[in-house]
Amino acid sequence: DFYGENTFRGDLCNADVAMGDLLIHEGAALAAQKHAARVFNADKAYFILNGTSGANKVVMNALLTPGDLVLYERNNHKSVGYGALIQAGAIPIYLETARNPFGLIGGVLDHCFNEEYIRMLIAERDPRRARMDRPLRAAVIQLGNYDGCIYNARQVVEKIGHLCDYIVFDSAWVGYEQFIPMMKDCSPLLLDLKPDDPGIIVTQSIHKQQAGFSQASQILKKDSHIKGQPRYVPHKIFNNAFMVNSSTSPNYQIFASLDMNAKMQEGDAGKMLWHECIVNAIEARKKVLRHCRYLRPIVPPVVHGKKWEEGDTEQMAEDIAYFAFEPGGKWHSFQGYAKGHYFNAPMKLQLMPPGSQMETGE
């Protein structure tokens, strides 16, 4: 009674011809994935029913072979390590990441995006490839992490894109960035990519901050600008990795939730939905600042010469400065950041407890 009869009616066999085979992408399944690709500004979308842990392994298995060099953020999820380093046998070039005095995980330090520094790290593993124009098969970056640190994807691509065949952005904890105008530079899928740019792959946990059931994830592939080049990964190879990491007994309810999520995000309706969410998130922070004595949200104390909570909510929802990790700011105390490189996730309401001195970073 709790679940209802339709839950069981919807648990279909994978041999139902009318639904189409999810593993080879046909029929209604293919139409749903094509629609999601259009909504999310990708060339292809692959719906994943075993979470972004599964999605990451698909991507790593498709891109990497034994001995490939992969630029590897230290904060990458273990599924990336398993797929890239254990299953695929790639060689990691590790990038250092920040952690502040409050224990929060940050992004890659600015000096790690310096080409000379990266080539020096590569030379320690493979001097010959360190001299190549494009020495890295892939870079893997956590576009947004569990503690709310979001990258400026445009800066990442501009700084290291020419060194990589592909850049993979693990966007498990975000995915909404392209629907919020002030966050457009955080979305690698909105970039105008040329033949010399890297291929872009984004993995998203739709079940986290979007509208999917548990384990609903998707892979968004944007690499038509490098099609025909030796580094391009065609659908046949990518789908082999997809099938290896998928079940022949899929759950259609999870799949349907991925389709519905794309429909919810589509067009102006999706942007209005996220605008309402961000307005509510800003108002919630303001109420904490005004009424709570012992708790404080993680926001800059002053923006544009006024206290954060004194800003106009509608204007704040359009201005990324209210969420930017400016270099040297005591309120976040992350060291090694560049200007405009990182932002605090606007949808993640984080509160600092008593004893944390955000004025001094202690």
Range-by-range predicted roles:
Residues 43, 66-67, 343-346:
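A short, charged/proline- and glycine-enriched loop
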Residues 50-65, 69-292, 334, 338, ...:
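Conserved PLP-enzyme active-site core in the AAT-like
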Residues 21-30, 36, 140-155, 168, ...:
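Short N-terminal signal/transit or membrane-insertion segments
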Residues 40-41, 195, 212, 342-344:
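A generic structural signal for short, non-catalytic loop/turn and secondary-structure boundary residues
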Residues 5-54:
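Conserved N-terminal alpha-helix of the aminotransferase class I/II PLP-enzyme fold
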Residues 274-362:
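Conserved PLP-binding catalytic core of the aspartate aminotransferase-like
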Residues 31-45, 166, 171-183, 196, ...:
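Short N-terminal secondary-structure initiator segments
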